[in-house]
Each structure stands twice: as C-alpha cells, then as structure tokens.
UniProtKB/Swiss-Prot annotation:
Top-tier EC class: transferase
GO biological process: one example: coenzyme A biosynthetic process
Annotated CDD domains: PPAT
Protein name according to UniProt: Phosphopantetheine adenylyltransferase
C-alpha cells in the first residue's frame, strides 16, 4: 500500500489544495493530509480549526485522512510510515523553494521521495495567503474555497 503525505498549513484549505488532494487520491492508496502547526506563522484559524476544515472538505474522499502535526515534516512522515511527500507547484518560485526542501528532506529521511503536482489552470494563482487577505479586507472568497471554509471565514472575519 502506497501511503503519502500532503503537508501544509492550510490556513485555509482552498479549492487549489482540494484539486491536488483529489488528484493525488486517484494516484495513491492512502493520502494523509498533514496540517502543520506552523507556530512562526500568524494564522487565521487554530490548528484544531484547520484540521476540522480539511476533514470536512475531504470527507467525500474515502482514502484521505487528516492529522495535525508540529515539528519536522520528516519526523511526521516517519511516524506515519509514509515515504512519499506530495507537493503542489504553482510557479517557478514554488519550484525553487520546493527543490531546496526536497534536498533537505532526503538528507534527513533517506528514501523519502517528493512528487510534485501542478494545479488545474484555474487555481494556478490561488493561495491561502491571498484568500485570507481578500477575506480580511471584506472581499468575497466563496469561489476559491470549499463551502464549509467559506462559512468559517465569514464567521471568523465578522468578529
């Protein structure tokens, strides 16, 4: 059984993330969405909220599970007994960053492989950062996120 991890902060999960997850779910036996605590980032949603939103957004995918983690991704991968990391690439900037990370992952966890997927064209510009910024400033992000996330964002930014 090929078990892979798709890691990220997912603050919030977007339709671009969901596109990558859905396509990876068709390629691998089991996908674990690793939701990173990312304490150095100022997140809109808590780790627990992000895990819940990812779970709700992927509930229709039977071979996808979600787990929060803190610390190194390679340690999480080792704990989950996964040796493949799925990463999304939108631009050449993403590629350069991910290429560096991949080299580090291989040093820290020999045998780990990274698989890169590009999003569907309509999501190539989309990022959680953009969604957060637009939402915080009163913009409508409904078309960019799953319905449960849209509802959660509206509630969160109304406070």
């Amino acid at each position: 059984m090929k078990k892979v991890i798709y890691p990220g902060t997912f603050d919030p999960i977007t339709n671009g993330h969901l596109d990558i997850i859905t396509r990876a779910a068709n390629m691998f036996d089991q996908i674990i969405i690793g939701v990173a605590a990312s304490p150095s980032k100022k997140t809109l949603f808590s780790l627990e909220e992000r895990v819940k939103l990812v779970e709700e957004s992927t509930a229709h995918l039977s071979n996808v599970s979600t787990a929060g983690f803190s610390g190194l991704l390679v340690d999480f991968a080792r704990e989950q007994e996964a040796n493949v990391l799925v990463r999304g690439l939108r631009t050449t900037v993403d590629f350069e960053y991910e290429f560096g990370l991949t080299s580090m992952y291989r040093k820290l966890l020999p045998g780990v492989e990274s698989v890169f997927l590009t999003p569907a064209e309509e999501y190539a510009f989309l990022s959680s950062t953009i969604v957060r910024e637009v939402a915080i400033h009163g913009g409508d992000v409904e078309q960019f996120v799953p319905k449960c996330v849209y509802t959660a964002i509206k509630t969160k930014v109304a406070k």
